Amino acid sequence: MVQYELWAALPGASGVALACCFVAAAVALRWSGRRTARGAVVRARQRQRAGLENMDRAAQRFRLQNPDLDSEALLALPLPQLVQKLHSRELAPEAVLFTYVGKAWEVNKGTNCVTSYLADCETQLSQAPRQGLLYGVPVSLKECFTYKGQDSTLGLSLNEGVPAECDSVVVHVLKLQGAVPFVHTNVPQSMFSYDCSNPLFGQTVNPWKSSKSPGGSSGGEGALIGSGGSPLGLGTDIGGSIRFPSSFCGICGLKPTGNRLSKSGLKGCVYGQEAVRLSVGPMARDVESLALCLRALLCEDMFRLDPTVPPLPFREEVYTSSQPLRVGYYETDNYTMPSPAMRRAVLETKQSLEAAGHTLVPFLPSNIPHALETLSTGGLFSDGGHTFLQNFKGDFVDPCLGDLVSILKLPQWLKGLLAFLVKPLLPRLSAFLSNMKSRSAGKLWELQHEIEVYRKTVIAQWRALDLDVVLTPMLAPALDLNAPGRATGAVSYTMLYNCLDFPAGVVPVTTVTAEDEAQMEHYRGYFGDIWDKMLQKGMKKSVGLPVAVQCVALPWQEELCLRFMREVERLMTPEKQSS
């Protein structure tokens, strides 16, 4: 009102001058507000460069001192064999660490996956307990795992320059088991994306093809492990954040039941949200490495350091069983149309399992749209996104989050109005908008009760068919960079099992063929909406990229899930078994 009156009082050139002043003032305010964020970007990238230089120097120094070491042979060793050679002293832990430090430095040049070098790994070697199950094993960490003296930024400027006071529990347990954490890896800003880019460290790219996303939010882990720069990593998963990068980068990953592994000490941007459970899980080149990691973490040390974790040690007899399995399966969830390669991967895996003596039974959890649109979205954004948005004050918003942040910033009434207006043409977007509104405590309790009822319903369906495990499609191949943020509906295959809190893992089983690529030209999706169109566009030019399937078990049955994953791996990629 004041601006309008001033404008009316000043004719001609004076009015134009005043308008220019207003614009200049707005720009100046915006520039001033972003000063802190710009400084954080500069400091973060300086720290990243310094860490990478230290990695290069350490690796080169070791190579000069040990010119006869066969680095390629060491890097090719599967993790179980690597551990065996470390325990037998056939390999020195220094040789393993600095070989992987050098490899991580090398692959980072093409992927931008490493954010920090955990330089005390060099002194950690002398402290690593020789009897530990992971003695001498270099381990990479998603940046959200706090590490004493290191920032865990999540790509947000407010977290830059705030080093952790202590290690998170799982990092502490890794060290007690002899492992040597050596790098932090990149994440999408806030970790609420299945792409991998942020203003502090930039875009991480897929090691198979640089125009493709590595997935997210554990995308740095996927890129590093997928390119051979780490034998084992830890990620987190609240909507597919371990499984997307594992699928896109051609590695294995496990999302356990939410509370099977400790989350104490993890850095996050929203605390207290319990409707959809976050999980901590391992990522590696093969299933046996995942099992080894879980075996090491499920120990008395973790149960002592975090008494809220159920004291359930790894059940070896379940993992090593060879009894035939009764496997439920579905080719599609009827929400996200599978790509031709996804459907083929499930059918070929089904045929191989049947040929090996397992029983395959059609199965599809009920009411998947409700689980995704109402239960999951409503649970994640039950405060209307208010807490989430607090992290972005004065900060840049990465393009991978642009649409989400813009929607969450809308007033409650406008979200409702838009949901009503777009419903005839975009029913999925309408449903997501409706459930991104804030709700009262009473309504939140109702939602959480609905989730419990839904979980019991699916378990009853599962048990009615006497299933051991379930085989499902996994989103693949990798999407183009920046496409995940505009293909939100494609989280359906993974998000369902966060809502249900079932353990789920992914195993690569094939690659995209020229025939798959040709068939993708006819892909329209089930709704033909903007998400389906982006998915079709984002999956083009993918011949040769990895394709995975998802393996699911009931809550607390991680060992059975891993056993099923190992069987799929044995049948579909026998070269891993022979190595």
Swiss-Prot record:
Inhibited by O-aryl carbamates and alpha-keto heterocycles. Inhibited by trifluoromethyl ketone. The active site is at K142 (charge relay system), S217 (charge relay system), S241 (acyl-ester intermediate). The keyword Oxidoreductase does not apply. It comes from the Eukaryota. The keyword Hydrolase applies. Residues 404-433 dip into the membrane without crossing it. Its EC number is 3.5.1.99, 3.1.1.-. Residues 30-403, 434-579 are cytoplasmic. SUPFAM superfamilies: Amidase signature (AS) enzymes (SSF75304). Highly expressed in the brain, small intestine, pancreas, skeletal muscle and testis. Also expressed in the kidney, liver, lung, placenta and prostate. InterPro entries: Amidase_CS (IPR020556), Amidase_dom (IPR023631), AS_sf (IPR036928), Endocannabinoid_amidase (IPR052096). GO terms for molecular function: amidase activity; fatty acid amide hydrolase activity; identical protein binding; monoacylglycerol lipase activity; phospholipid binding. Optimum pH is around 9.0. GO terms for biological process: arachidonate metabolic process; fatty acid catabolic process; monoacylglycerol catabolic process; positive regulation of vasoconstriction; regulation of trans-synaptic signaling by endocannabinoid, modulating synaptic transmission. This is Fatty-acid amide hydrolase 1. It comes from Homo sapiens.
